[in-house]
């Protein structure tokens, strides 16, 4: 399948204008947080959505969808490969206050990583949690580490050992709220919702019997 980067870039710029960098929910009333991640076997992708109790950090439920992915991985355009899988799940699953997405939100060359793409197109509050930096420079912001791009703080950095997590706005959440929620949910290498989604998707992908 041919991938048109120019048209994809234009769509990203248009959608980036629709991102809301403010809380569309009450941060004090959060009860359940979902995590989204994708694993692959060949050209088949498995998207998993894991719901975690925000107070106890215990897993509540896990959901998944399996489908062939016709679009190849293109740096900066991950959403066009993985977002359709995520959106299929989001339409089916209820009972969460926001979603953590494995990938970037606003920390993207055109301001629309997969977390923002998924958030804007679904209307669901999302947070980007990425393991690698796409844009910006790391600086000190008081007692925190932050990522600054074009003169603006676009992410906070959370460290767990040698692992860095870049926490950014996806959609319908403020950066401060995104940081506080991810920090609370991260007791090991990854925030619990994404860690569970990663485990589930990897396990299912390994078990697939492909022709």
Swiss-Prot record:
InterPro entries: Endonuclease-V (IPR007581). GO terms for molecular function: deoxyribonuclease V activity; magnesium ion binding; RNA endonuclease activity, producing 5'-phosphomonoesters; single-stranded RNA binding. One of its GO terms (biological process) is DNA repair. GO terms for cellular component: cytoplasm. Keywords: Cytoplasm, DNA damage, DNA repair, Endonuclease, Hydrolase, Magnesium, Metal-binding, Nuclease. The record marks 73 as: Interaction with target DNA. It holds the Pfam family Endonuclease_5. Its EC number is 3.1.21.7. Belongs to the endonuclease V family. This is Endonuclease V. It comes from Ignicoccus hospitalis (strain KIN4/I / DSM 18386 / JCM 14125). The gene is nfi.
